[in-house]
């Protein structure tokens, strides 16, 4: 995760960098197809976001390594990019809590929602079922790079907080917190995928 990767850089290196190497070696030996879960942080802030944090850098570097393995060893692969996944069973506590789950938990406990400044950071929140459907489709039909899986609707973090109808407190800015990310879903949509869920409706159900 982006902000936490500064503190847990050793974990980022072990899980992201060493992890993908092990997976690629497995794919090379077995002939399996790899569907790699890249990160939309690669497209943050007009392309500058890929170096904004240890997390973003390792995920972006991994996509290049996957492509190189395709060229060097002829492995079969497709690279997907997730955009701010939300849904059931998210982590709601601790430093790895996801935004929607964290806000939901705070509202239930009548606590203040905290938003990292400036609050105008935009995100394309995408429901987990839409993500899974995209992965399956790309796994069956996709080849190569560039399969973004993300909702076309984008909202600022402050807009999301206001949907919960609670008290809001602004926090100082943090390292690696990108403002935007380019949505690259054209290749995935060409396979027949589209986002079918709406974050506003999901939040309304959560707080009702």
Residue ranges and their predicted role:
Residues 54-56, 67-123, 128-139, 162-165:
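NAD(P)-dependent short-chain dehydrogenase/reductase
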Residues 7, 15-18, 52-53, 57, ...:
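Residue-level signal for the nucleotide or nucleotide-sugar donor/cofactor binding architecture
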Residues 23, 66, 103, 187-189:
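Structural element of the ATP-grasp superfamily
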Residues 1-85:
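N-terminal Rossmann-like NAD(P)+-binding domain of SDR-like oxidoreductases, especially those catalyzing
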Residues 107-208:
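C-terminal substrate-binding subdomain of Rossmann-fold SDR/epimerase-dehydratase oxidoreductases
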Residues 46, 88-91, 158, 187:
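Short beta-loop-alpha junction of Rossmann-like oxidoreductase domains
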